């Protein structure tokens, strides 16, 4: 018979008592009542926060958006096909955040900051909340540095400053994305980090943009955040905030950033879909009541920081698509009222071969003129005035056949000025090139040329001045002013090239 030793038993019991740990972990859990259409209704989750991430039993993550008296409405960040009624859900205690680092440059990622370009994981030691508060009034300073787009029409008449929000608005297929990508290409060597956010676009369109940026070496300073048309509405809604969080990371590190949202109409549609499925009451055009706040809290994050915070900046170029030129629809009017100006692209101008198809008459920049360099101000004022007068005269001249000589001259000048604003895609011009181009047009040097010869002459003139009158560009880049000396170099160059050009054309 086995002898039972009481001292051994008491030792074991004592050890067990000493090892006993009374730590209690409280997990906030709930049960799935209903799931479908990217929405789940959860019973329980009593302590959940608005916007908190929740995790389903099979691994899908969701965001708690509707906190109701008897259930919680959760939007899913995935298809959620494996979620079953009655399965458990636990709150994570975290608000949506993404990892951020310099390693994201040159990469294509999704709204959760996971790479989708097949080039491996991205290392990051820091993280930022996707929805962080915008800088306050004291944290900002007024816009004073220019952000050059490389497009004459914009940089001369609708200038953009670093820290500004400028809307690009127009119908489909009017070149909105082209204006945005040209602006990214023009930031080469300007020490500006670019973030391009594609929301609900065709995957082929996004691939095209990425390829054109790679070919021209622009991906080195660019991050692409893409949620294509087949992505869940939740991720399309989150993508712009992810892009803003990445741009903010660089802005607070005393760098300049440019962010493009292409386009916010699709984000609003994704948000409308989520809201209607969550049974939130619909308003105008069936959008929920807080669709203005959706865009205002995003665009207010663009800022020019004060000198105490390092003078970093975040310039936002949101894109909005209109239906047959209707700028008075709900989303366009909302975004126009939030931004500091808009660039209006017209389908009629586009079809008439005027590209970029910018309607200068109704495009405006509310703060950018403070950021223009002096040399550009000197030449752009005259250009604006002459184009405005030309537009007015052109409308009148359609009704009248016998025009006096002065009117005919003014119309001829206007047609040539319109011609000099035309630019090929992916061919941005430097400020110096823009100044020489505008000066040539406004001072009548193009009046003797046929309209068809204008662009050919300007291309040759820019090359000629670059090689034979480099002093002009040096003076402009160092003084930022069109000095008398610079003007004399420019006049000489134009006269010489004009004589050469006319001689060669006659042969």
Swiss-Prot record:
<dbReference type="InterPro" id="IPR038376">
    <property type="entry name" value="ATP_synth_asu_C_sf"/>
</dbReference>
<dbReference type="InterPro" id="IPR005294">
    <property type="entry name" value="ATP_synth_F1_asu"/>
</dbReference>
<dbReference type="GO" id="GO:0009535">
    <property type="term" value="C:chloroplast thylakoid membrane"/>
</dbReference>
<comment type="subunit">
    <text>F-type ATPases have 2 components, CF(1) - the catalytic core - and CF(0) - the membrane proton channel. CF(1) has five subunits: alpha(3), beta(3), gamma(1), delta(1), epsilon(1). CF(0) has four main subunits: a, b, b' and c.</text>
</comment>
<feature type="binding site">
    <location>
        <begin position="170"/>
        <end position="177"/>
    </location>
    <ligand>
        <name>ATP</name>
    </ligand>
</feature>
<comment type="function">
    <text>Produces ATP from ADP in the presence of a proton gradient across the membrane. The alpha chain is a regulatory subunit.</text>
</comment>
<keyword id="KW-0150">Chloroplast</keyword>
<comment type="similarity">
    <text>Belongs to the ATPase alpha/beta chains family.</text>
</comment>
<dbReference type="InterPro" id="IPR033732">
    <property type="entry name" value="ATP_synth_F1_a_nt-bd_dom"/>
</dbReference>
<dbReference type="Pfam" id="PF00306">
    <property type="entry name" value="ATP-synt_ab_C"/>
</dbReference>
<keyword id="KW-0547">Nucleotide-binding</keyword>
<keyword id="KW-0066">ATP synthesis</keyword>
<keyword id="KW-1278">Translocase</keyword>
<dbReference type="GO" id="GO:0043531">
    <property type="term" value="F:ADP binding"/>
</dbReference>
<dbReference type="GO" id="GO:0045259">
    <property type="term" value="C:proton-transporting ATP synthase complex"/>
</dbReference>
<dbReference type="InterPro" id="IPR000194">
    <property type="entry name" value="ATPase_F1/V1/A1_a/bsu_nucl-bd"/>
</dbReference>
<keyword id="KW-0934">Plastid</keyword>
<dbReference type="InterPro" id="IPR023366">
    <property type="entry name" value="ATP_synth_asu-like_sf"/>
</dbReference>
<dbReference type="InterPro" id="IPR036121">
    <property type="entry name" value="ATPase_F1/V1/A1_a/bsu_N_sf"/>
</dbReference>
<keyword id="KW-0375">Hydrogen ion transport</keyword>
<keyword id="KW-0406">Ion transport</keyword>
<keyword id="KW-0472">Membrane</keyword>
<dbReference type="InterPro" id="IPR000793">
    <property type="entry name" value="ATP_synth_asu_C"/>
</dbReference>
<feature type="modified residue" description="Phosphothreonine">
    <location>
        <position position="257"/>
    </location>
</feature>
<keyword id="KW-0139">CF(1)</keyword>
<keyword id="KW-0067">ATP-binding</keyword>
<dbReference type="GO" id="GO:0005524">
    <property type="term" value="F:ATP binding"/>
</dbReference>
<dbReference type="Pfam" id="PF02874">
    <property type="entry name" value="ATP-synt_ab_N"/>
</dbReference>
<dbReference type="InterPro" id="IPR004100">
    <property type="entry name" value="ATPase_F1/V1/A1_a/bsu_N"/>
</dbReference>
<dbReference type="GO" id="GO:0046933">
    <property type="term" value="F:proton-transporting ATP synthase activity, rotational mechanism"/>
</dbReference>
<feature type="site" description="Required for activity">
    <location>
        <position position="363"/>
    </location>
</feature>
<keyword id="KW-0793">Thylakoid</keyword>
<keyword id="KW-0597">Phosphoprotein</keyword>
<dbReference type="InterPro" id="IPR027417">
    <property type="entry name" value="P-loop_NTPase"/>
</dbReference>
<dbReference type="InterPro" id="IPR020003">
    <property type="entry name" value="ATPase_a/bsu_AS"/>
</dbReference>
<protein>
    <recommendedName>
        <fullName>ATP synthase subunit alpha, chloroplastic</fullName>
        <ecNumber>7.1.2.2</ecNumber>
    </recommendedName>
</protein>
<keyword id="KW-0813">Transport</keyword>
<dbReference type="Pfam" id="PF00006">
    <property type="entry name" value="ATP-synt_ab"/>
</dbReference>
């Amino acid at each position: 018979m086995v002898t039972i030793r009481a001292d051994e038993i008491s030792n074991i019991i004592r050890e067990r008592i000493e090892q006993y740990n009374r730590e209690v972990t409280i997990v906030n859990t709930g049960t799935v009542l209903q799931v479908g259409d990217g929405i789940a209704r959860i019973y329980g989750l009593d302590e959940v926060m608005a916007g908190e991430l929740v995790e389903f039993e099979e691994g899908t993550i969701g965001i708690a958006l509707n906190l109701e008296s008897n259930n919680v409405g959760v939007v899913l960040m995935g298809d959620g096909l494996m979620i079953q009624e009655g399965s458990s859900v636990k709150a994570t205690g975290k608000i949506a955040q993404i990892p951020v680092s310099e390693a994201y440059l040159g990469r294509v990622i999704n709204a959760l900051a996971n790479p989708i370009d097949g080039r491996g994981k991205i290392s990051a030691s820091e993280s930022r909340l996707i929805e962080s508060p915008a800088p306050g009034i004291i944290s900002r300073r007024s816009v004073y540095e220019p952000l050059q787009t490389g497009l004459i029409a914009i940089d001369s008449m609708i200038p953009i400053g670093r820290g500004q929000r400028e809307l690009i608005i127009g119908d489909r297929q009017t070149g909105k994305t082209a204006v945005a990508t040209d602006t990214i290409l023009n930031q080469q060597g300007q020490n500006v980090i670019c973030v391009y956010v594609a929301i609900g676009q065709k995957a082929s369109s996004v691939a095209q943009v990425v390829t054109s940026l790679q070919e021209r070496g622009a991906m080195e300073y660019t991050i692409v955040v893409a949620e294509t048309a087949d992505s869940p509405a939740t991720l399309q809604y989150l993508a712009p905030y992810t892009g803003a969080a990445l741009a903010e990371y660089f802005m607070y590190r005393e760098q300049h950033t440019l962010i493009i949202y292409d386009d916010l109409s699709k984000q609003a549609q994704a948000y409308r879909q989520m809201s209607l499925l969550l049974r939130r009451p619909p308003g105008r055009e069936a959008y929920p009541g807080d669709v203005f706040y959706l865009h205002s809290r995003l665009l207010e994050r663009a800022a020019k920081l004060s000198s105490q915070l390092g003078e970093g900046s975040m310039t936002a170029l949101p894109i909005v698509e209109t239906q047959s030129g209707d700028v008075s629809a709900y989303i366009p009017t909302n975004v126009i009222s939030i931004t500091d100006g808009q660039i209006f692209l017209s389908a009629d101008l586009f079809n008439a071969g005027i590209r970029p198809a910018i309607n200068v008459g109704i495009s405006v920049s509310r703060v950018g003129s403070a950021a223009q360099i002096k040399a550009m101000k000197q030449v752009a004022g005259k250009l604006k005035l002459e184009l405005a007068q030309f537009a007015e005269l052109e409308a009148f001249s359609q009704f009248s056949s016998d025009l006096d000589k002065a009117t005919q001259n003014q119309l001829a000048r206007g047609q040539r000025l319109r011609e000099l604003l035309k630019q090929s895609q992916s061919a941005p011009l430097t400020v110096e090139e823009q100044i020489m181009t505008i000066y040539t047009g406004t001072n009548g040097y193009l009046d003797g040329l046929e309209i068809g010869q204008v662009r050919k002459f300007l291309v040759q003139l820019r090359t000629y001045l670059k090689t034979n009158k480099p002093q002009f560009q040096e003076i402009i880049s160092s003084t930022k002013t069109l000095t008398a000396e610079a003007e004399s170099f420019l006049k000489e160059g134009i006269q010489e090239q004009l004589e050469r050009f006319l001689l060669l054309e006659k042969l």
